[in-house]
Every structure is written in C-alpha cells, then in structure tokens.
C-alpha cells in the first residue's frame, strides 16, 4: 500500500471525517513511514501486534511500543515510524485529530 510518499504492507481506513480519522496499518520488516510532521493533528498510536518503533526529533527519542502500548505525538513534532521487530509484522491503530490532515515530509 502506497501512502503520501512511502510504501507499507497494508493500510485500512476504519473511519474518516473532516477533522478525525482512524486507520489500521500493517508494517512488514523494513517498512518505514519516513520523517514527517502534521500541522494540526495529534497522532495516537496503539500497538496491536509485533512492536512499533517511534522516533522523534524534538525531543530526540527512540521508543519501542509493545502490544497493548500506546504513544502520542503532538502537532508539528517531527516523527518517523517503523516496524520494531524484523521477525514479524507490526500492526497498529492510528487515530488522528482533531484538525485538517496533512503529511509534511522532511529531510532524513
């Protein structure tokens, strides 16, 4: 499945409105959602299977979210998402809102 400027194993839109959306992602080993930020929306990640790696720049952090865990990223915070386990797929629910969605890619 091809996203704004990346490819991952699958993305399923669960619900989408003018200012909120819910999507179910599956990332295979090596799948990466590149560095980006959102102008208005907050991202909430909920790990459902495998492990999810969440990297941020300000503050610089590298977190591994396990099954049952969650992580919040505020608007304008640069972040990169990847599969945290080369041995199995990572599945996560992403809730985004409240505000207009955008995907602003930034340099690696």
List each language-model region with its residue ranges:
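A short, N-terminal "cap"/entry segment at the start of jelly-roll beta-barrel domains
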Residues: 1-24, 34-35, 71-72, 103-108
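Short strand-connecting beta-turns/loops that link adjacent beta-strands
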Residues: 18-19, 40, 59, 86-88
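Short, surface-exposed secondary-structure edge patches
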Residues: 24, 44, 60-62
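Short, conserved beta-strand element in jelly-roll/cupin
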Residues: 27, 38-54, 95-97
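Glycine-centered loop/turn positions within well-structured domains
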Residues: 33, 42, 71, 79, ...
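Short beta-strand His + acidic residue motifs that chelate non-heme Fe in jelly-roll/DSBH
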Residues: 35, 54-55, 73, 78-86
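A short hydrophobic beta-strand segment most commonly corresponding to one strand
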Residues: 44, 72, 87-104
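Short acidic-glycine-tyrosine-enriched beta hairpin
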Residues: 59-76
């Amino acid at each position: 499945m091809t996203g704004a400027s990346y490819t991952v194993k699958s993305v399923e839109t669960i619900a989408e409105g003018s200012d909120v959306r819910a999507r179910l992602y599956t990332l295979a080993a090596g799948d990466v959602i590149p560095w980006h930020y959102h102008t208005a929306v907050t991202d909430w990640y909920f790990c459902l299977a495998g492990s999810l790696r969440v990297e941020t720049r300000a503050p610089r952090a590298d977190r591994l979210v396990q099954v049952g865990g969650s992580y919040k990223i505020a608007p304008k915070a640069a972040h990169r998402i990847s599969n945290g386990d080369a041995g199995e797929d990572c599945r996560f629910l992403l809730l985004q809102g409240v505000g207009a969605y955008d995907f602003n890619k930034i340099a690696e």
